[in-house]
Design a protein with these regions (language model features):
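C-terminal closing repeat unit and adjoining cap/tail of repeat-based domains
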Residues: 153-154, 158-165, 175-176
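Beta-rich, blade/repeat-based domains predominating
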Residues: 1-10, 39-50, 81-93, 124-136, ...
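Conserved beta-strand positions in repeat-built beta-propeller and related beta-rich domains
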Residues: 13-19, 53-60, 96-102, 140-146
Length: 176
């Protein structure tokens, strides 16, 4: 059940398998496939500029930094054991941004210090941030708990939010 995939600059494909609780690596040229057991429900994935592969875990309150060579994962716990993360994004300063869907918050992990800071999403604890993208170091995400969904922009420099209702009625935005 591969869920999210990302190509690494070295040409290998890394992926999450949410139901199986595994991370995988495929070398397209040789067909070599490596899979490892990991924390519960690995979901979103992003490759950082330094080559680290960041993983969001939807079954725990953790983020993971996967070493592409050793396939070892360093875990970072986010506040509140009930937190769940589906998607994440990376800014040019190396920060890891995530939507905390069960707590209605967005957060930032500093991988150098392990420090985590969270901000409440504009629509509150039931807003359920889901998809997340970083554009020009500004965080964009949706609040999937709202009807209709809301699109939210967060500027890390000013710590200001803007949001817009998405009137399509088409359901939940799951990826950006």
């Amino acid at each position: 059940d591969p869920h999210t995939a990302a190509f690494h600059p070295d040409g290998r494909l890394y992926f999450t398998t949410q139901g199986a609780g595994m991370l995988g690596r495929l070398h397209p040229e040789t067909g070599e496939l490596t899979e490892i057991q990991t924390e519960s429900r690995p979901y979103g994935m992003q490759v950082a500029a330094n080559g680290t592969i960041w993983v969001a875990y939807n079954g725990t309150n953790k983020l993971g930094a996967l070493d592409p060579e050793t396939m070892e994962v360093r875990y970072y716990e986010v506040p509140n054991g009930a937190s769940r993360i589906r998607r994440l994004g990376l800014t040019s300063d190396g920060m890891v941004w995530y939507g905390n869907s069960t707590q209605g918050r967005i957060g930032r992990l500093n991988p150098q210090t392990g420090e985590i800071k969270e901000w409440p999403s504009p629509s509150g604890p039931e807003s359920r941030p889901y998809a997340l993208a970083v554009v020009d170091d500004v965080i964009w995400y949706n609040e999937s708990g709202m009807r209709p969904d809301a699109l939210v922009r967060f500027d890390p420099e000013t710590e200001q939010f803007q949001s817009w209702a998405i009137p399509s009625g088409a359901g939940i935005i799951r990826n950006m």
